[in-house]
Amino acid sequence: MDQEIFIIGLNHRTADVEVREKFALTGCTSLEPAVIPLGNGISEVIILSTCNRVEIMVAGRGDDVPDTVLSLWANARGQHPEELRPYVYIHRGLAAVEHLFTVASSLDSMVLGEPQILGQLKDAYRDAVARNTTRVILNRMMHKAFSVAKRVRTETAVASSAVSISYAAVELAKRIFGEMNEYKAMLIGAGEMAELAATHLLNCGVNKIYVANRTFERGLELAKQFDGEAILFEELFTRLPEVDIVISSTGAQQAVIRAKDIRDVLKRRKNRPMFFIDIAVPRDIDPDVNNLDNVYLYDIDDLKEVVEENLSHRREEAAKAKAIVRSETEVFGRWLRSLDLQPTIVDMYSRSTEIAQEELLKTLRRIGPVDESTQKALEAMLNAVVKKIHHEPICFLKRRYEEEDSGQRYIDFARRMFNLDNEPEQPEAHKNRKRPQPDLPAGCPGKTIL
């Protein structure tokens, strides 16, 4: 194959956040024509740029492609290539394909199994297609990457369990209550953790979200994001009987909720169960609350145990996912190698079609004019014959080429056998001379040729 796949990139493992910011390409959404132009050995390009990685996927010719990309990338950010080089990795050929499949399956993410990377890859591909910078190779590779990612999520549990504190908190609530659409939740505090928890609660279908925050305006802002209701912090215990799930993350120096407060709340709730999740440090909720009947209290240490247990489970599932990635990389590699066959297959069909057309014209001259429908029927018949004659030889070529390292020998033999390169015929004097046996590839029919 005259073209090769390269991936040139950096990520959260090879570069800290300052370096990633310096060389990010998010400002030019995948690429503008001036950043990584086609040409100079580059025939296809896609750029993925996120907060945790920049990866430039290229199909091109020549050993200098990575250096060309590196220079263009650095120049686009107003930096010298040597400033970028220490942080960059380069994958080539099937190693590049396997790397992409690994990334798409979220096996290379900072949080193993997180789903965002697949969407980011799809956005990068969509942008490249819109800019007309992809062709057969990268198009096929990206679609295969999406298929591999789907297979990994379907056949493994690599993304099935909570690995963030906020997500784990909501997952615990779901275990207690089951379906969440009949239950109401209250967030005490309106910081980042509360915002993440609200997102997960909403995704789980919780009936309503209340937000209690010392700064009412901030609570109101968060509540509006999730179609919830902000309440004054002073009204906290007045409104608590209405809710079933409480997630607290105020960062206060003393407990915000004490056991005696919850006893009164439970009486007003007629002892219906309540679920408290304290993700604040120092803790917002007095641990004695957990001694009350029909109350479930978890603090951040409990959640960390859940997260670590789930991460361990994800790591086990990642081993299965990597086996899928390796298998699919081999499949893609066979397709990639089969591209070498395409010119020969096209030439075989072209030569046979040309001969068929010549013979059709001879026949028509001999039998005289025919009507248009008859001529179309004859042409369709000849095309069908050409396809059927070539079906078995082409299947044979593909099988041998995929299965054996010496695939080029089969291409060479097919080209000689069908004289696709228009080599001159043997002179008349040599026609009756016994020919030496050609060095046919193993498995070819007709080992003896007179």
From Swiss-Prot:
The keyword Nuclease does not apply. It comes from Oleidesulfovibrio alaskensis (strain ATCC BAA-1058 / DSM 17464 / G20) (Desulfovibrio alaskensis). It catalyses: (S)-4-amino-5-oxopentanoate + tRNA(Glu) + NADP(+) = L-glutamyl-tRNA(Glu) + NADPH + H(+). Substrate binds at residues 50-53, 109, 114-116, 120. This is Glutamyl-tRNA reductase. Residues 422-450 are annotated as: Disordered. Its EC number is 1.2.1.70. The record marks 99 as: Important for activity. NADP(+) binds at residues 189-194. GO terms for molecular function: glutamyl-tRNA reductase activity; NADP binding. Belongs to the glutamyl-tRNA reductase family. GO terms for biological process: protoporphyrinogen IX biosynthetic process from glutamate. It is an enzyme of class 1 (oxidoreductase). The keyword NADP applies. Keywords: NADP, Oxidoreductase, Porphyrin biosynthesis. Pfam families: GlutR_dimer, GlutR_N, Shikimate_DH. PANTHER family: GLUTAMYL-TRNA REDUCTASE. During catalysis, the active site Cys acts as a nucleophile attacking the alpha-carbonyl group of tRNA-bound glutamate with the formation of a thioester intermediate between enzyme and glutamate, and the concomitant release of tRNA(Glu). The thioester intermediate is finally reduced by direct hydride transfer from NADPH, to form the product GSA. Pathway: Porphyrin-containing compound metabolism; protoporphyrin-IX biosynthesis; 5-aminolevulinate from L-glutamyl-tRNA(Glu): step 1/2. Possesses an unusual extended V-shaped dimeric structure with each monomer consisting of three distinct domains arranged along a curved 'spinal' alpha-helix. The N-terminal catalytic domain specifically recognizes the glutamate moiety of the substrate. The second domain is the NADPH-binding domain, and the third C-terminal domain is responsible for dimerization.
